[in-house]
């Protein structure tokens, strides 16, 4: 049996391929930054569908025009953020996207996937 050593810095990489389950929502943050919120539904071969919230800072304007039903490749990292709402501390786990590409753009999707996999430590 072999063992794998994970680097101390760790790796936080999320790759999703799924369907945009609702139209994107573009919001302006108090900082002035814009965030595009996406809801991506992933349907594993043997299992129930899972809905994954995605936040994309600095998304290109064209992405706000995507519509529900579009198949997307999402590359990013998992983040759990905490906030106060209605006087209570709440949390939300989401994928913070670094790249989102419609899968119909096969060359761009392949490039994004290869780039993401290239960030993994060599010893994995």
Annotate each language-model stretch with its function.
Residues 1-124:
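Single-stranded nucleic acid-binding surfaces, predominantly the OB-fold ssDNA-binding core
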């Amino acid at each position: 049996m072999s063992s794998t050593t994970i680097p101390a810095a760790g790796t936080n990489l999320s790759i999703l391929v799924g369907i945009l389950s609702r139209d994107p929502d573009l919001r302006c943050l108090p900082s002035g930054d814009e965030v595009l919120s996406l809801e991506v539904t992933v349907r594993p071969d043997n299992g129930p569908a899972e809905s994954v919230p995605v936040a994309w800072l600095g998304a290109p304007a064209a992405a706000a025009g995507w519509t529900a039903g579009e198949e997307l490749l999402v590359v990013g990292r998992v983040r759990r953020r905490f906030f106060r709402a209605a006087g209570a501390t709440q949390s939300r786990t989401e994928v913070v996207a670094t790249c989102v590409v419609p899968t119909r753009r096969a060359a761009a999707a392949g490039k994004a996937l290869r780039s993401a996999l290239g960030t993994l430590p060599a010893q994995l």
